[in-house]
């Protein structure tokens, strides 16, 4: 009995121990599961945090905000790879672009005259004219019409219908909704493109957290703009510009894109030889009789430009001292005559008058008609325009005058050349690029680096100044149309120290930077050399300006002169050769030494 009881008690204790062990195991397992659960929760929370912080955003960008379109009638304007700040409009189902954007970014040939309320476009042989708020227009005097209003005025802004623009420019355009936008392309030739390897997303900025601009499908072509780290900036066909991961795109390749549109062809009267032009300053009819003796010592001269025409008034009337005998003499010497017309010295003579003249369509027409009458009457070969009073606000009126004059010159087979200052920021309103499209020659007056009103002495035409003018001009105009003009003159400078009183009076002004009072006079080549010889001054070659230089003291003044001679002119002619220009011009006949002509002739053959 006792043994059985002991066995029972023993088994009971053993079972209790087993139960305890099982309970402890269950407790440990539960505790382990709880720990594992908390670990999983922590990892999940951390993962979510990391994903939110570093994972790609799925937020769709607001395209209205992206394009800056904040009104239902507004339309974004995309030109090639640029979204313009200016906005177009949609009216009666037609897309319209702001005039300034059209002129600056798409086609500078459009000309809007706000005072007259007309839009013009000069074709090679005819003029298109459109009144505002009209479906009708004239082309070569013939009335035509569209089924939409061509030009709209809203507030102080003028808009042109996209469909009308496409009739003239070498540009394509596609329009889209949601949001309204116009995508224009005129960057013909070689462009860089790439293709999506897989479905991917375009983002606003180069980063996965940036908002999504567009879904890009596998095989979609995009236009490559630039690389930014692991991203590529690209443009879609429908004008969205953003970033795609480089790994989602194939290698960039170069394609050639050609235009299917037909832009107007402005034929040119450029010659098959280098131009060697000299301006002949003629101030009265009697001076015309000096031509034979004036050109007697020249060599290789191809063209002469007498200063015959001045604009008499702001209505477009002309003062003329043209001569048939002069033209006959020039033609007998195998010279073409390109008669010069100017807006100074002898008629109108201020920026205000030039503006009044050129901003009037009637005055421009009157002036052009008067010029062509003279050309026909005297058998003149071409017109040389020398307008030096064109203000910035007059710039677009000036270039429209050149375009309209080019129509008549083209119709009558007469050469049109335009004189220009050395291109700089402050005279960019002369619009060399537009001149180069319609004029036969664009002449750069490569002198007056230092002029009569300069506050310091200096060269009239140092080599760097001349080359900069040529370099800038040939960026905008075909080299064969560019003529560089050289000076047959120089300036003798006189410097006298400013007094203390003068310096005090000029304190705080730009003029105060210059410690000398300077005056100068223009001298021809022979006169300049005689002046140096009379002073007994030594002449040294100045490598920086590529000119011979002399300096001397006399009666408390310092005299300085940078000579123009065979050496300096040849240095400038080498630039003509280097840039393969259309020729050389010179101001003015009678200022040169005879041996200059053999130097010039060497470079124009």
Where do the protein language model's features map onto the residues?
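Catalytic domains of carbohydrate-active enzymes, especially glycoside hydrolases
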Residues: 287-312, 370-383, 572-583
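Primary recognition of N-terminal secretory signal peptides and signal-anchoring hydrophobic helices
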Residues: 13-228, 258-270
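Glycan-binding loop/region signatures in secreted carbohydrate-active enzymes
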Residues: 259-261, 346-347, 353, 490-572, ...
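Active-site-adjacent "subsite" loops/lids of carbohydrate-active enzymes
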Residues: 345-373, 377, 444-454
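SH3/SH3-like beta-barrel fold
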Residues: 121, 219, 231-236, 244
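Boundary/entry segment of secreted carbohydrate-active catalytic domains
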Residues: 199-201, 240, 245-294
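Hydrophobic faces of well-ordered beta-strands that scaffold small-molecule active sites
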Residues: 276-280, 302-306, 337-341, 383-385, ...
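Substrate-binding surface in catalytic domains of secreted glycosidases
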Residues: 314-321, 369, 392-530
């Amino acid at each position: 009995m006792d043994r059985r009881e002991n066995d029972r008690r023993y088994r009971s204790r053993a079972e209790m121990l087993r139960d305890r062990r099982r309970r402890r195991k269950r407790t440990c397992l539960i505790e382990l599961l709880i720990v594992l659960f908390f670990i999983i929760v922590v990892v999940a929370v951390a993962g979510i945090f990391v994903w939110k912080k570093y994972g790609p955003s799925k937020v769709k960008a607001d395209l209205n905000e992206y394009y800056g379109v904040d009104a239902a009638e507004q339309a974004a304007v995309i030109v090639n790879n640029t979204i313009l700040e200016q906005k177009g409009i949609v009216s009666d189902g037609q897309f319209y672009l702001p005039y300034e954007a059209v002129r600056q970014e798409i086609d500078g040939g459009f000309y809007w005259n706000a005072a007259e309320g007309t839009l013009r476009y000069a074709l090679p042989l005819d003029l298109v004219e459109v009144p505002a708020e009209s479906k009708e227009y004239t082309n070569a005097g013939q009335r035509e019409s569209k089924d939409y209003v061509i030009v709209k005025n809203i507030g102080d802004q003028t808009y042109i219908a996209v469909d009308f623009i496409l009739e003239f420019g070498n540009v394509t355009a596609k329009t889209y909704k949601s949001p309204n936008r116009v995508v224009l392309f005129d960057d013909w030739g070689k462009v860089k493109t790439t293709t999506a390897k897989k479905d991917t997303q375009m983002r606003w900025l180069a980063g996965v957290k940036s908002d999504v601009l567009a879904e890009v499908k596998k095989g979609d072509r995009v236009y490559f703009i630039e690389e930014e780290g692991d991203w590529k900036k690209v443009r879609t066909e429908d004008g969205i510009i953003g970033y795609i991961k480089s790994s989602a795109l194939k290698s960039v390749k170069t394609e050639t894109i050609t235009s299917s549109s037909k832009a107007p062809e402005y034929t040119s009267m450029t010659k098959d030889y280098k131009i060697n032009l000299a301006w002949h300053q003629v101030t009265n009819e009697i001076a015309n009789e000096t031509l034979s003796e004036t050109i007697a010592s020249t060599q290789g001269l191809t063209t002469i430009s007498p200063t015959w025409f001045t604009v008499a008034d702001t209505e477009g009337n002309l003062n003329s001292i043209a001569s048939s005998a002069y033209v006959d003499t020039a033609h007998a010497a195998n010279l073409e005559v390109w008669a010069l017309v100017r807006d100074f010295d002898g008629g109108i003579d201020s920026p205000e008058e030039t503006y009044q003249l050129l901003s009037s369509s009637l005055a421009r027409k009157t002036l052009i008609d008067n010029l062509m009458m003279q050309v026909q009457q005297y058998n003149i070969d071409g017109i040389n325009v020398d307008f030096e009073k064109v203000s910035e606000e007059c710039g677009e009126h000036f270039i429209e005058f050149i375009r309209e004059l080019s129509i008549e010159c083209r119709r009558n087979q007469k050469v049109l050349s335009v004189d220009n200052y050395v291109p700089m920021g402050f005279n960019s309103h002369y619009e060399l690029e537009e001149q180069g499209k319609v004029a036969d020659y664009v002449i750069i007056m490569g002198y007056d680096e230092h002029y009569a009103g300069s506050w310091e002495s200096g060269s009239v035409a140092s080599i760097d100044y001349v080359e900069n003018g040529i370099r800038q001009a040939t960026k905008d105009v075909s080299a064969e149309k560019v003529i560089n003009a050289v000076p047959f003159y120089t300036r003798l400078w006189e410097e006298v120290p400013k007094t203390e009183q003068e310096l005090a009076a000029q304190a705080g002004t730009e003029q105060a930077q210059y410690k000398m009072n300077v005056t100068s006079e223009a001298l021809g080549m022979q006169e300049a050399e005689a002046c140096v010889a009379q002073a007994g001054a030594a002449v040294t070659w100045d490598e920086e300006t590529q000119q011979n230089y002399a300096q001397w003291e006399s009666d408390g003044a310092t005299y300085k002169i940078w000579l123009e001679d065979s050496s300096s002119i040849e240095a400038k002619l080498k630039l003509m050769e280097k840039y393969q220009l259309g020729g050389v011009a010179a101001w003015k006949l009678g200022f040169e030494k005879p041996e200059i002509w053999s130097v010039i002739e060497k470079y124009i053959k």
